[in-house]
Amino acid sequence: MSTVTITDLARENVRNLTPYQSARRLGGNGDVWLNANEYPTAVEFQLTQQTLNRYPECQPKAVIENYAQYAGVKPEQVLVSRGADEGIELLIRAFCEPGKDAILYCPPTYGMYSVSAETIGVECRTVPTLENWQLDLQGISDKLDGVKVVYVCSPNNPTGQLINPQDFRTLLELTRGKAIVVADEAYIEFCPQASLVGWLAEYPHLAILRTLSKAFALAGLRCGFTLANEEVINLLMKVIAPYPLSTPVADIAAQALSPQGIVAMRERVAQIIAEREYLIAALKEIPCVEQVFDSETNYILARFKASSAVFKSLWDQGIILRDQNKQPSLSGCLRITVGTREESQRVIDALRAEQV
């Protein structure tokens, strides 16, 4: 008699799944953490809601209203979730039939689009970006049949550049009546003029992902948003968990999105942008650095001579960067989160000491 293991009982696609390799999963024993695009220092909040004996609201009113005001949309166009990652998954669950429909994304880009689709049993199609990391619109057009959701990260993680707005328009026209286009704007606070939020009225099939993890310095809170037209939001509400945000999370999120919270966020953004330019200028003068790419975000992508050796050398010194070598077209590339001036100096000094 054959013995069936617990693993044998699991769905085949789950058995074959490679989980997303988050910065925390990859580990390390560093004291300079520049691998997860987090804000470098903690922001203090006081909990004001003490009614923890009661279940929270499904969509906390103060959070929704504050975010709607900040983003310039109606409250009915906002969904709050456990990070933007949950929004990625909700869109697939709401719009894609497992075994029938597909999602499409354009590597090199964020890894959770594929993980979410594969977990649910939805096909992933990829159309690599062009040499300048812009969209291959012809390639996308050729692969759209059967695609229900298209993910485009702008500014793109890990490359740091914005997608050409005219290409976004072309994509939205190509997909009208066929698929949802998701603009992942996790880093939009670092270049707010590039947001597509003003396009929602024109494109009923546009959805926008946002987060409090980056510029709002709340990666540990796990709070993100989907902005879309009311018809899309209503569908997402059918598949979201009944209580996605705990009471303390909603409490802190509402404070972060208050007028004074927004002012503080914008001050942090200005500080990070200044630090980014300092770090870019320094990296360009370092012998082991072959190329530094322009960035509209809180991280910098650079190509290194002997990048694996450089990555390990810094790792051994407690400086944890993100290796991008396995991403399409990113051979030799490492991604560096913009931290404090002290952290930037640690990186600069360590790289200058590398023998090339």
From Swiss-Prot:
MF (Gene Ontology): histidinol-phosphate transaminase activity; pyridoxal phosphate binding
EC number(s) given by UniProt: 2.6.1.9
Cofactors named for this entry: pyridoxal 5'-phosphate
Pfam families tied to this protein: Aminotran_1_2 (PF00155)
SUPFAM superfamilies assigned: PLP-dependent transferases (SSF53383)
Pathways per UniProt: Amino-acid biosynthesis; L-histidine biosynthesis; L-histidine from 5-phospho-alpha-D-ribose 1-diphosphate: step 7/9
Keywords for the protein's UniProt record, in alphabetical order: Amino-acid biosynthesis, Aminotransferase, Histidine biosynthesis, Pyridoxal phosphate, Transferase
Catalytic activity line of the entry: L-histidinol phosphate + 2-oxoglutarate = 3-(imidazol-4-yl)-2-oxopropyl phosphate + L-glutamate
Gene Ontology biological process terms from the UniProt entry: L-histidine biosynthetic process
KW Flavoprotein (keyword) present: no
Modified residues (N6-(pyridoxal phosphate)lysine): 214
InterPro entries assigned to the protein according to its UniProt record, in alphabetical order: Aminotrans_II_pyridoxalP_BS (IPR001917), Aminotransferase_I/II_large (IPR004839), HisP_aminotrans (IPR005861), PyrdxlP-dep_Trfase (IPR015424), PyrdxlP-dep_Trfase_major (IPR015421), PyrdxlP-dep_Trfase_small (IPR015422)
Presence of keyword Nucleus: no
Family statement drawn from the similarity comment of this UniProt entry: Belongs to the class-II pyridoxal-phosphate-dependent aminotransferase family. Histidinol-phosphate aminotransferase subfamily.
Assembly, per entry: Homodimer.
Family annotation (PANTHER family): HISTIDINOL-PHOSPHATE AMINOTRANSFERASE (PTHR42885:SF2), HISTIDINOL-PHOSPHATE AMINOTRANSFERASE-RELATED (PTHR42885)
Name by which UniProt lists this protein: Histidinol-phosphate aminotransferase
